[in-house]
Amino acid sequence: MKILVTGYTGQLGFDVIRELKARNIECIGTTRNEFSLTDTEKMQAFVKAYKPDVVIHCAAYTAVDKAEDEVELCDQINHLATKELAKVCKKTDAKMIYISTDYVFAGSGENFYEVNDEKAPQNVYGKSKLDGELAVQEILDKYFIVRISWVFGSNGKNFIKTMLNLAKNHDKLTVVNDQIGSPTYTVDLAKLLCDMALSDKYGIYHATNEGICSWYDFACEIFKQADIKINVKPVPSTAFPTKATRPHNSRMSKKCLDKAGFNRLPAWQDALQELNR
């Protein structure tokens, strides 16, 4: 089996490649230079030449606020490039794993979103990822759509690194407490994605670590595990206005993982502890 991983220098792609190599599965990771999501011909030629059995599509435009001003670029990368990648997967009979997001939902209420609940993205980024999902479903039969949220890992920027860096120069921080969701540890997710790649249990899944929290709760746990004494004050989202609307409710049900026989990811607190080891 051969697996192609897009965006392998990013947070998730980095750990997916590492997990595949640990399992002795032949794989290749793509960079922007050799596999440009804005150059359809180059992208298709790369896939046809490598002939993967599975494409794990981690590469994405993720600058949520910037996307409000770069609508076309965001759509090109998250939607149109995904559509073209799905087409070449269809031609080469490759499975495709598309990484999506909680942002496809409205992000209101307090219930856990099921995979087939109504989609109502509230910003440009969320709409582009939903359009990518729809393209994959329209073109392919052999696909996995995996929705995640609040991603963290050892490679790249994330909330944990931001908090720890801020703590170096501040003795007091304010963190939003009215956005609720679940962190996703890239190492745990990479294991699940590799399990999916080896299966034919196609469909849409939610795959965050177990448990829910607010960003404030997350920050408090980060400092607790790092043994950093700092005053963290909870504040509403209105204290930090952003160009793009953020979901207040990112709770996502993982029933589909259970139904398919996939293991759920460990508790987010345990994942954080694992990262700190």
Where do the PLM segments sit?
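N-terminal Rossmann NAD(P)H-binding glycine-rich loop of SDR-like oxidoreductase domains
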Residues: 3-20
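Adenosine-cofactor binding site in Rossmann-like domains, unifying the SAM/SAH pocket
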Residues: 21-45
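NAD(P)H-binding glycine-rich loop region in Rossmannoid oxidoreductase-like domains
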Residues: 40-77
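Active-site "gating" loop of Rossmann-like NAD(P)-dependent oxidoreductase/epimerase domains
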Residues: 61-64, 69, 101-123
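NAD(P)-cofactor binding segment of oxidoreductase domains
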Residues: 69-97
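NAD(P)-dependent short-chain dehydrogenase/reductase
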Residues: 134-181, 187-188
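Mid/C-terminal beta-alpha module of Rossmann-like enzyme folds, strongest
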Residues: 192, 199-241, 248
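Conserved C-terminal active-site "lid" loop/helix of NAD(P)H-dependent oxidoreductases
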Residues: 214-216, 220, 236-275
